[in-house]
Swiss-Prot record:
Belongs to the acyl carrier protein (ACP) family. The gene is acpP. InterPro entries: ACP (IPR003231), ACP-like_sf (IPR036736), PP-bd_ACP (IPR009081), Ppantetheine_attach_site (IPR006162). Keywords: Cytoplasm, Fatty acid biosynthesis, Fatty acid metabolism, Lipid biosynthesis, Lipid metabolism, Phosphopantetheine, Phosphoprotein. 4'-phosphopantetheine is transferred from CoA to a specific serine of apo-ACP by AcpS. This modification is essential for activity because fatty acids are bound in thioester linkage to the sulfhydryl of the prosthetic group. GO terms for biological process: lipid A biosynthetic process. This is Acyl carrier protein. It comes from Nitrosococcus oceani (strain ATCC 19707 / BCRC 17464 / JCM 30415 / NCIMB 11848 / C-107). One of its GO terms (molecular function) is acyl binding. NCBIfam families: acyl_carrier, PRK00982.1-2, PRK00982.1-3, PRK00982.1-4, PRK00982.1-5.
Amino acid sequence: MSDIETRVKEIVVEQLGVNSEEVANESSFVDDLGADSLDTVELVMALEEAFECEIPDEEAEKISTVQEAINYIKERQG
């Protein structure tokens, strides 16, 4: 597991208040982890802060799973 993957999962656990065992790469923030729209906004903000990047709203709307968040950060950190 990469550092980015580990950190993204830690942020998901912190922001959504779920157990780390529940967080799989294919987990949907809304469908699997019970996030609402405010949760997803706060999650994106936490990712931006942790990885020192900006995620535009139109890009954030496309990030709906843990793996999509990991891929987005990896592409920007490349």
